[in-house]
Every structure is written in C-alpha cells, then in structure tokens.
C-alpha cells in the first residue's frame, strides 16, 4: 500500500509518499524471526530488547507496547525481561492460507519519546494436513477404440500445506492398461493425468476399478486416495476440442452475482451422442472456485462475490466431454480488477489525555492507517481541521503522530474535539473519520488577580471590635488547587503602623475585620497591602492596596479655651460705660475634637444678669453690647454662654463670663467673686464718689504704666504685663481646633495685651510650651490673633 504527503489550503493534510514507506526511524530496522506453526503458546520467540539494543528497564520507563494490525494480539512482550512471547498457538493455514511466505508484521511502539521498531515473524509450514480428493470416486468413460498413449485428465487432490509438504506425486494401483503421469501447473501445484498403455477390449473387460493415491513431500509423507471407475464404451473416433486452449479475461471485483464472465466453446466432429459436448469445471475446483459453468452452453458465471484483496486472480480449468467419454480441456485465466471498495482504516495505538497546557511538541496520539485496495485506491491522505493547534507527523510505515503545534492555554480552551480524516485517492474517494477528545490539564501559569487594584473602606469610629469592615476578592483563571486563593496581610510600609493590632483578614474569603475600636481623633486613615496567593507549585501571588478611612462620630463635646472655666481666679472683662452699641466685650473661643459638621460650632447667650444688654454672634463667639450703657445698669454682670456643635445628636458646653462696667481705667480692679448677684444692687452715691475720686487720683499714673506695659507686651510675649491667671495643669487631651486641622495634645499659654491708644486687647494662642509630636499640619498654631477690646487681667 502506498501513501503520499500532501497539503491543501483548506486542510493541513499529510500523505505518505511511496518513498516514505521505506523510511524508518533511526535505530528501527526490521527484525525478523521465524518459528514453525502450531508452536505452543508461551513460547519465547526471542529477547526483543537485546536484539534492538534496548535496556530491559527502558521498555517499562518508555511505555513499550506491541501494535498489531487488526488489533489481534498474537505476540506478547514481557517488559520486565524483554522477551517476545507467543500469545497463542498459530495455524499458518488459517492465518495465511496459500500465501507463501507467511509473514506477520508487528510494530514495537515506545513512548516518551516516540520511536517505532518493525518486527516480522515468519511462520514456517509443518506437514499437518493430508491430501484429500474432492470425490471418493471418479468416473471415466473410455471407448474401446482409444489408442494407447491417450491422456485422460484427473481431478487433483487438495493439500492445505505448502511447499514440499504439499502434494508431490500421484500413483495408481498396479494394472496392465494405465499409468499416472504427474505434471506441474503454472502456480507450482501438481496435477495427475491417466495415460492409456494398452488398448481396451469392452468384450473382455467392460469396467475397471483403480485406486489413485496422492502423496505429499513431508517427513513422514501423508497420502490420500480415491477410486477411478473406468467404463469401456463402443468406438468414439473424435474427442472434443476447444477453440482456444487459454482464455484470458478481467473481472471487476464488484461484479454482481450471476454476471457472465466468459463463454468457452468446444466442438466434436462425431455425430449423434458422440458429438454432443458437456462442459464442467475440472480438477475439483467446484467447491473453492466462485464460478459456475453451464454444461450445455459453456457460459461461466459468477456465483460468489469476488474480493481482489483476498484473491487477485484465478486459474480455472474447463473440461468438455462428449457422449462417448472422450474429453478435452482448456484453461481460463481470470484477473480480478481492483475497485475502490474499501474505505481506509484507522487504528489508534495510543492516546494521551489530558495533556499539560505548557508543553509544545507533546505527542497526543499515535495511530496507523491502512487500505487493502491497490494503486490509487490504496493511496491515502490524512488530515485534521486546520483551525487547531495540532499537527500530524508521519513516522514509521503507515504510522502518524498527532502532536501539539504550540503551547496550549487551558484558560482559553480546556478541551479539543479533533476529527482525523483518512481519504483514499480512488474513484470515488472513500474516507474514514475518527473523533478524539483531548483534554488540556491545568498548569499554574496565572497569578490571582484582585477585582480592584485598590480598595477604599469606610469605618465609623467607635466601632465594635471584630466588626467586618469590608472584603477583598481575587480570582485565579487556573483550576483545581492552582485556583484556590489564600489571603494575607502584607507587612506595612510604614514601620510605625501597628497593623496587626488594627485589622485582620480571613485567609479563605478575604473578609477584613477591625480588631479594636477606632478613634477618628487619634487615627483618621491608614493603608496597607493585602496579598492573594494560590496553592499551585510554584505558588503565584498578587497584591492590592487597601485604604481605610475612619469616619468621624460626634463623640466630643465642644471645649471652651477662653475664658477658662476651671480657673481659681477667672478673668473679668472691663467695659467702659461710654461704650457704643456693638462694642466688642470679649470673644469666646472653643474647639471641638471632631471634624466636619460635628466640629461646626455655634454660640448662644444662654443667661445674662440683665437680658438685652449684651448680644452674642452665633458663628464667631463675639460678645458685644446691644445698646448704650446707662448709669442705671449694674456694674457687675454674669453671662452664661452655650457652645453647641452641629453633630447628630448635638453636643454642647457652657462658659461663664464676668463683665464689669467701669467709667475709666485709672486703677486695676480686683477680680470679682465667682458668683455675681443675680440682680443689680442699688446704686450708691457714696460708691460713685469713692470710685470717681480714686479714678481721678490714679489716672495719670495708670496711663503711664499702661503705656509701658503695652510696649513690653509687644516686644516680648514671654513676659506680658497684663495676663490672665491660668491654673497649672494640661488641658484635656486630643483637642482639635475649629477648622479640624489637627490634635492639641499639650498645654497652651494665652496672653491678653491691652494697648493704651486703641482701647482694644489682643488674644493670642501661643505655641505649646513643650514640643509635641503631632500629625502633619497639627503643629501649626491653633489660634490666630483675635482682637479683644478692653480685656484686662488682674494678677
């Protein structure tokens, strides 16, 4: 059988050229063994591994196996010892019939890497069959006038053995009239002829009975016998003669049954019964031949279907016998013409599935193709779909390997359905399709991928510990353990961030939990990295950034910085009675540790000794006079201010202000008692006279001292002349300024300076006495200079 290698634009086709039939892989020359037929099963034919130069252990490691055409297991390979064993008893006549020599072809297939070795096993014939005649008796009718030397053909004996074990000679029982001559046919077979030695006499002996013996050439020889019954007839002068001694015809193998093959014709010059001719197949071929002859017309017709692959030609001998017993013969040589009636056959030797996705040039399958037809009818094309990443490669005779053409990607396609098509070149073309499914196994070639490169989580402060604050998620395109993701917290880049005490992550699902209650005022935001690692080998990982923003809760009440409410000697604001409406009495300064609207403060005058005398601005905390002051107004006033934030619910604080109405600033005024009377005391003329006298007496001296104090205050803030008494001890921690720019963690100094020319004081927030470590921006001065009119502190 021939194959050719071809390729079309539509398909990647692979066809063996005739020369490829003789190409073998390196080191794979044919090894031939010979054993007699009927050898018992289990017989060790040879050590195949040794003959091929292979190590015994190599057979097992490379997956050695025997391949047989038709998948009939006749031989068995012991991969441990390398011995080739007979799997069953072999009968040459059953396996090969009359074909000589009888050779069985096997292939030794080695995987990883793929390699083929051709092995041939020849079965030699033994003399296990005796010759057999098709009939127990042959009848010959011979006229008594037949001349000595006349030859009479006899039917041959059948012997299924071949060569010297087939029929070699014929003998006849001793007699005085005949002997047997043995001749060779064109196909090497022997056939007998009966030769008349002495004329017959019907009156003396009308019938003879002889024994014909067929002997084969075996040792010892086997024989078979039949009886020849000869009937002596009256004179018959002429024997039938065929028009041709040899008829040559061609018969297509797909000819229908009973179709006419050829017509033979013989004539006899005698008249009457002696001139009547009857035709018959000769030499016992009636049983084995697929033909039948009409004894009257000589038409040879087909009685069984022909098969070129089984028997490509026939030699049929025809005998014509007249009524007197004389006969003639001719030979019909029939050549069976091959037609494309056999589709190609595909035998899968090995199939590897699944295959790893990262291994190009991987052998997926090894298979063989065959077509019993001849010529173009047996020439084949093998192909697969052209859109697949696979390639067909011819290897050994009639063998192909299916290999991966490039690296596969299981994530893109996890399996391939491949159709292997084998088409012959006959007319019409016949084809065979074989479908295989190749699964692609996963390799850990994809790292986990987070759904987002960064995550922003919002957590309201004062949360409960172990609260789930969010989750991260990563997917892996691989499968199995290669796709199982484990989450973890990566070491923080900020060495001062104690991440392990803040959050934790569930390694299985990526849920994030806050380990403790968060305080916005202490930590407003932080970020960290999370990792996702698969369980492949080697493991692959990726990371994502997580930002946690702490949302402020209204958990801090406003804190009044000025005036201080815990001082043993609270400040008193002096207001001249000549002050105009809108005169700035003082400014309440408060802060809120929260942020946003939780730190938006509003001010409200909650209580006053004399309602309507003072007013307060809601947004800046300024206390101003609401009207002109009169002599009837009490000198001492106590104001209660409410400071409230804008949180939900709102929080508040109160501050108490002491205001003293004076006519001038001629002398310092002692601090007022902590509690001012709720109602104004009655004016006393005596008090006014004393105050006026004291004021006039000390006006000049006081003015000079005030001027000097203002100058010194402006030059050096470290030693102000006028200063409110600030009790020792720090303020409450974690104070945030109104703008929410930072946290106040240390005590601050406050300073009230009074200028003589302007009549206005300056209220300043100074830098902390002890440097503190605050977040960026928190180290700035919390308060900017705020003007306070007529504010004066008494020591």
From Swiss-Prot:
Membrane topology: Single-pass type I membrane protein
Pfam families, sorted: Cadherin (PF00028), Cadherin_2 (PF08266), Cadherin_C_2 (PF16492)
Subcellular locations according to the entry: Cell membrane
Protein name: Protocadherin beta-5
Membrane-spanning intervals of the chain: 690-710
Residues in Cadherin domain copies: 35-133, 138-242, 247-346, 351-450, 455-560, 567-670
Residues annotated as signal peptide: 1-30
Classification via PANTHER family: CADHERIN-87A, PROTOCADHERIN BETA-5
């Amino acid at each position: 059988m021939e194959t050719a290698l071809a390729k079309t634009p539509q398909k990647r086709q692979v066809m063996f050229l005739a020369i490829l039939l003789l190409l073998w892989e390196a080191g794979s020359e044919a090894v031939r063994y010979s054993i007699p037929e009927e050898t018992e099963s289990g017989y060790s034919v040879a050590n195949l591994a040794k003959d091929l130069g292979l190590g015994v252990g190599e057979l097992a490691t490379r997956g050695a196996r025997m391949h047989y055409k038709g998948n009939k297991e006749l031989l068995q390979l012991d991969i441990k010892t390398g011995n080739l064993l007979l799997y069953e008893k072999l009968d040459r006549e059953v396996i090969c019939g009359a074909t000589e020599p009888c050779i069985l072809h096997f292939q030794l297939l080695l995987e990883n890497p793929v390699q083929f070795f051709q092995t041939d096993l020849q079965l030699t014939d033994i003399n296990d069959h005796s010759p057999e005649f098709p009939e127990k008796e042959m009848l010959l009718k011979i006229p008594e006038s037949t001349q000595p030397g006349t030859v009479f053909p006899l039917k041959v004996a059948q012997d299924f053995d071949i060569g010297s074990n087939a029929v070699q000679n014929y003998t006849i029982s001793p007699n005085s009239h005949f002997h047997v001559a043995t001749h060779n046919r064109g196909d090497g077979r022997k056939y007998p002829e009966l030769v008349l030695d002495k004329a017959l006499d019907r009156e003396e002996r009308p019938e003879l009975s002889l024994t014909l013996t067929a002997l084969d050439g075996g040792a010892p020889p086997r024989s078979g016998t039949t009886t020849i019954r000869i009937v002596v007839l009256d004179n018959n002068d002429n024997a039938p003669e065929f028009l041709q001694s040899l008829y040559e015809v061609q018969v297509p193998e797909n000819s229908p049954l009973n179709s006419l093959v050829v017509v033979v014709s013989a004539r006899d010059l005698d008249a009457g019964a002696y001139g009547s001719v009857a035709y018959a197949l000769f030499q016992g071929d009636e049983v084995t031949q697929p033909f039948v002859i009409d004894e009257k017309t000589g038409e040879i017709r087909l009685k069984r279907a022909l098969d070129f692959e089984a028997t490509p030609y026939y030699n049929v001998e025809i005998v014509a016998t007249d009524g007197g017993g004389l006969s003639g013969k001719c030979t019909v040589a029939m050549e069976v013409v091959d037609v494309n009636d056999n589709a190609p056959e595909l035998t899968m030797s090995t199939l590897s599935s699944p295959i790893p996705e990262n291994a190009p040039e991987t052998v997926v399958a090894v298979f063989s193709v065959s077509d019993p037809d001849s010529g173009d009818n047996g020439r084949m094309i093998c192909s697969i779909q052209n859109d697949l990443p696979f390639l067909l490669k011819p290897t050994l005779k009639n063998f192909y390997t299916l290999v991966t053409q490039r690296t596969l990607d299981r994530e893109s396609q996890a399996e391939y359905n491949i159709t292997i098509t084998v088409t012959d070149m006959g007319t019409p073309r016949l084809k065979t399709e074989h479908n295989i499914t190749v699964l692609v196994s996963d390799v850990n070639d994809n790292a986990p991928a987070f759904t987002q490169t960064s995550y922003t989580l919002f957590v309201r402060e004062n949360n409960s510990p172990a609260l789930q604050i969010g989750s991260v998620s990563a997917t892996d395109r691989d499968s199995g353990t290669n796709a199982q993701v484990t989450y973890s917290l990566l070491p923080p880049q900020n060495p001062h961030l104690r991440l392990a005490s803040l959050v934790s992550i569930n390694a299985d699902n990526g849920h994030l939990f806050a380990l403790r209650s968060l305080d916005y005022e202490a930590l407003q935001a932080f970020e960290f990295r999370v990792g996702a690692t698969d369980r492949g080998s080697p493991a692959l990982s990726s990371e994502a950034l997580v930002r946690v923003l702490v949302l402020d809760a209204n958990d801090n009440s406003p804190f009044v910085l000025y005036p201080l409410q815990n001082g043993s000697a609270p400040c008193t604001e002096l207001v001249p009675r000549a002050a105009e409406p809108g005169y700035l009495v003082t400014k309440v300064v408060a802060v809120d540790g929260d942020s946003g609207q939780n730190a938006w403060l509003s001010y409200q005058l909650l209580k006053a000794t004399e309602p309507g005398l003072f007013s307060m601005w809601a947004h800046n905390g300024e206390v101003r006079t609401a009207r002109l002051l009169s002599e009837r107004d009490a000198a001492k006033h106590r104001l209660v201010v409410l400071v409230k934030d804008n949180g939900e619910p709102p929080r508040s604080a109160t501050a108490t202000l002491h205001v003293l109405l004076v006519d001038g600033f001629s002398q310092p005024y002692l601090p007022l008692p902590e509690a001012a009377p709720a109602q104004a005391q009655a004016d006393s003329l005596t008090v006014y006279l004393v105050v006026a006298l004291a004021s006039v007496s000390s006006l000049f001296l006081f003015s000079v001292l005030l001027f000097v104090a203002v100058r010194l205050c402006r030059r050096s803030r470290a030693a102000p002349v006028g200063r409110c008494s600030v009790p020792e001890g720090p303020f409450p921690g974690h104070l945030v300024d109104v703008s929410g720019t930072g946290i106040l963690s240390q005590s601050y100094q406050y300073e009230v300076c009074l200028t003589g020319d302007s009549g206005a004081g300056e209220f300043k927030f100074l830098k902390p006495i002890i440097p503190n470590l605050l977040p960026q921006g928190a180290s700035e001065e919390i308060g900017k200079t705020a003007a306070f009119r007529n504010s004066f502190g008494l020591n």
